[in-house]
Amino acid sequence: MTMLLIGEPSLYSPSRRPSHQGQIIKLSPRKFANLPAPIIRALEARRCLIPQTDYKTKKKINVISGSFRTAGQKDWAAMCSRNGISSILVFWNGSPTSVAEVARMNETCWRALSVVGRQYILEHYEAYKEAGALKPPPIDHEGIDDGFCEKASTVRYWYRGKWLDLQGAD
């Protein structure tokens, strides 16, 4: 297994790495056997590595498939890490050329993607609506739960041509 630390080694020495971060490694897209070859090549062309963490599990994370734009359409999403920045790349209908980028941010701690459906989205809205959670639109396909730092998550949901940030776990 190839292991790379994020950023410059001096920034992530044990004394300077945030304690909640855990050990983050990055894998080549080729390490994901279920990922279609055209998407692997597209990720490599963008120089993406897929961030992982050894916290709690050795299971590979941050490559998922689901219906993120239209029910029944198989889309792929991967966390792309480059130069200390991570973002979610969504390959619509499995196409390596029809790609949306969402949630681009500095890598200050690990992130983990999962597929969520209508029930999860509505339950989290109900639990947090008194705290000002955004009311979701009609839910007719899946969303991407973007968890970070083992603290909270945001559901990325495609609606009417743009990404909405809906309430996730807190």
Feature roles, as predicted:
Residues 1-38, 105-170:
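Acidic, small-residue rich beta-repeat scaffolds with periodic aromatic anchors
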Residues 27-57:
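Short, non-transmembrane alpha-helical segments in secretory-pathway proteins
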Residues 59-66, 76-78:
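N-terminal post-signal-peptidase region of extra-cytosolic proteins
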Residues 63-71, 93:
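Acidic, divalent-cation-chelating loop motifs in proteins
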Residues 70-80, 136-145:
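Acidic/hydrophobic-patterned starts of short beta strands in beta-sheet-rich repeat architectures
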Residues 79-81, 124-125:
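Beta-strand C-termini and the immediately following turn/loop, strongest in propeller blades
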Residues 84-90, 153-155:
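Structural motif
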Residues 90-106:
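Extracellular C-terminal loop/segment signatures of secreted glycoproteins
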